[in-house]
Amino acid sequence: PVSFYTEASVNLSQRADLIQAMTEANFQYVFLGIETPSDEGLKETHKFQNLKGSLVDSVHTLLQGGLWVMGGFIVGFDSDDDTIFRRQREFIEQAAIPWAMVGMLQALRHTALHHRLQKEGRLYPDSTTGDNLSVPNFQTTLPRATLVKGYCDLLESLYSPQAYFKRAIRSLELWGPRKPQQPAKLGWDLKIKG
């Protein structure tokens, strides 16, 4: 059978009926833009839906409903201090998210963030943007060397074999049962009309 993958907001976890319908339709994975465990960072990015209730509980609800969770995370918000790397790691471990896509914040053109940073004179001239493998294209409040080192250390700690497999096993323990999928029933008496 065909399986599906989608991206959704965290408030999907509040819709048990939709989670059930998705798993019955063979949705396997959902990507969530969690961004940060920091309330200040979530307010800064206007991710107000991520402030309602526990993000860890939301992830666990989706896992228990039968959906694998992948998460997107960002470091380098103005409100971030040097504790953000530890807090991101602890959150990802507690939530049992094996696939955590972590990047450093970029100010993409034509966004409110880009306009604000341009007005503040914080954009670096002639910088490229658009991927999560580059250093930020603006002057961050956290010293750049601290941000880059913290980011590299975070990735190294998240993707050490021991840490990764511990999260993977924990997510399997939380993952809810799914109904077996049956192949579509097709009639074999189809005729091609010419």
Where are these regions (language model features)?
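A structural motif corresponding to the C-terminal lobe/cap of the Radical SAM core domain
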Residues: 3-191
